[in-house]
Each structure stands twice: as structure tokens, then as C-alpha cells.
Amino acid sequence: MRLGAGFRKPVPTLLLEHRSRKSGKNFVAPLLYITDRNNVIVVASALGQAENPQWYRNLPPNPDTHIQIGSDRRPVRAVVASSDERARLWPRPVDAYADFDSCQSWTERGIPVIILRPR
């Protein structure tokens, strides 16, 4: 499979700032996103690997962070979607990037959906 082959249309990307839960160092992860009302939604797919990505594991101890979309830097609070929220939201990123469904089929873990709420 060719990565990126699942794009059905141009997909917006953002930069997510996250602080290491171990070292305290700051990092930036480029991620695909969709919007849901005033919220920004990202998916911790890690391309279907067995473990969640580092950026995702860094968010629970440090949920207040920033994202950058274009030149717009925004403060957000990262919240993992509940099972009901995930069920409602999951089809939307899959519609934007079909490979998310493939990634889910490659792993036994439920791929988390993260809601980035303005703060």
C-alpha cells in the first residue's frame, strides 16, 4: 500500500505542540485534522501500529496545549472522545482519509479520536 493513497481530496494539516510526559521537552507533530463546530479533531492512528503515537501519550498529563493552522496559533485543551463521541466522529476523518479505516483494521487497539477544544 502506498501511504497517502487514501486521500480523497486535499486534507488540511495542523501542527500540534505537545510536551513529553517524561523529559518535559516540547515537540511538534504534523497531523491531519477535521473540524466539528468550534472544535478541531485529530486521530491517533500511528498508521495502525500496536501502540498509540507518542504525541497522543503525551497529551493526558499535559492537555492544555497549542495548535497551529497556517499562521494561526491557537490555545486548545485536548480531550479523548468518549465512545459515543468517537462513534459519531469516526466517519468524518475516514471520509477525508480512507486509510484511517485500513489503519484500524491493522491493529487491535481502538484508534483514539482527540477533540481539541478552544480554551
Swiss-Prot record:
Keyword set, alphabetical order: Cell membrane, Membrane, Oxidoreductase
E.C. designation(s): 1.1.98.-
Cell membrane among keywords: yes
Annotated Gene Ontology cellular component terms: plasma membrane
Catalytic reaction(s) noted: oxidized coenzyme F420-(gamma-L-Glu)(n) + a quinol + H(+) = reduced coenzyme F420-(gamma-L-Glu)(n) + a quinone
Highest taxon in the source lineage: Bacteria
Coiled-coil ranges per UniProt: none
Enzyme class: oxidoreductase
Localization terms from the record: Cell membrane
GO molecular function list: coenzyme F420 binding; oxidoreductase activity
Chief subcellular location: membrane
InterPro entries: F420H2_quin_Rdtase, Split_barrel_FMN-bd
UniProt-annotated binding residues for coenzyme F420-(gamma-Glu)n: 21-23, 27-32, 43-46, 54-58
Entry annotated with the keyword Oxidoreductase: yes
Pfam hit, one: F420H2_quin_red
Bilayer disposition of the protein: Peripheral membrane protein
Protein's job: Involved in a F420-dependent anti-oxidant mechanism that protects M.tuberculosis against oxidative stress and bactericidal agents. Catalyzes the F420H(2)-dependent two-electron reduction of quinones to dihydroquinones, thereby preventing the formation of cytotoxic semiquinones obtained by the one-electron reduction pathway. Since menaquinone is the sole quinone electron carrier in the respiratory chain in M.tuberculosis, the physiological electron acceptor for Fqr-mediated F420H(2) oxidation is therefore likely to be the endogenous menaquinone found in the membrane fraction of M.tuberculosis.
Family membership: Belongs to the F420H(2)-dependent quinone reductase family.
NCBIfam families documented for this protein: hi_GC_TIGR00026
Protein's name in the database: Putative F420H(2)-dependent quinone reductase Rv3178
Species for this entry: Mycobacterium tuberculosis (strain ATCC 25618 / H37Rv)
